[in-house]
Amino acid sequence: MKRLSIIVIIGIFIITGCDWQRTSKERSKNAQNQQVIKIGYLPITHSANLMMTKKLLSQYNHPKYKLELVKFNNWPDLMDALNSGRIDGASTLIELAMKSKQKGSNIKAVALDHHEGNVIMGQKGMHLNEFNNNGDDYHFGIPHRYSTHYLLLEELRKQLKIKPGHFSYHEMSPAEMPAALSEHRIIGYSVAEPFGALGEKLGKGKTLKHGDDVIPDAYCCVLVLRGELLDQHKDVAQAFVQDYKKSGFKMNDRKQSVDIMTHHFKQSRDVLTQSAAWTSYGDLTIKPSGYQEITTLVKQHHLFNPPAYDDFVEPSLYKEASRS
């Protein structure tokens, strides 16, 4: 009887071991078969929803894809990687993406990255009523000429009744702007967070205007995906956008958004807390009306001929995704 019991126990161990090995092999095989999605970004609050998406994905037992976030330090390098197909998508300036589409790049915008979160900074102690047509030109830093930040400054110039040409612009990476302001190389800058809050924290800058006060809820950054991913792996793209949509509503929880940014960005928690107060997420649908506002401004400022909404935006993935 004792011998029989030992044989039974050994048999159970053998069967269990085989099952464990089979399960382990199946998991390994599933991991190998997962589609890897490479998404480019700059370390700004506008891209933080990607980090929340990656965190959400890590909580799944059987994720449908792998998300690889690829960090860039400037917009030209990011767009070169996107347009050449070295990455599958990006969180990028909407105007840059529109220009790439107009030039023939195989990309589509599927969702916004954020709402608000843009500032116009000036030297500490500066006031808007100091701007006039009598003095020297005013030199501002912008991340790129094809950006909502350029449009915000040009619209502010018009609101202040400053003649064209009195605002000059210098393209620089967002991270360079607070130092350039401190060194008086520029009189101000327009940029994404957290570099507005950082400028104030360093004691050299002052927020002259929030973007919303110049152009209410102007679209700024969008999530774009390459056509190859959308055409050849539609189910994977849908799963990614599903998680991205869920994460956008999670980002409206201020503590969660600050936690995720503190984990991924270099700035202090105080700076990122201020940035989070100026940036919102939630519903990230690219609406025709919001897109039309940007295309109108792009045309008014003679930047380029923008693509039509239907040519540039693929709204169905975000629309069909559940928020919970």
Where are the model-predicted features located?
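Short, low-complexity disordered leader/linker segments with a strong preference
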Residues: M1-V36, R323-S324
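Secondary-structure end/capping motifs
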Residues: D231-N305
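Ligand-binding clefts/hinges and TM-proximal coupling segments of bilobed small-molecule sensing domains
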Residues: D19-R22, Y65, R145-G165, Q242-T273, ...
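Conserved C-terminal helix/tail region of periplasmic/extracytoplasmic solute-binding proteins
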Residues: K299-S324
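Pocket-lining segment of extracytoplasmic ligand-binding domains
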Residues: E95-L96, H170, A175-I260
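Short helix-loop capping/hinge motifs at secondary-structure junctions, enriched
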Residues: G125-N133, K161-P164, E228-A237
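Soluble non-cytosolic domains of exported or imported proteins
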Residues: I44, F72-P76, S91, P143, ...
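Short, glycine-/small- and polar/acidic-enriched structural segments
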Residues: E26-L160, H170-E171, I187, V191-E193, ...
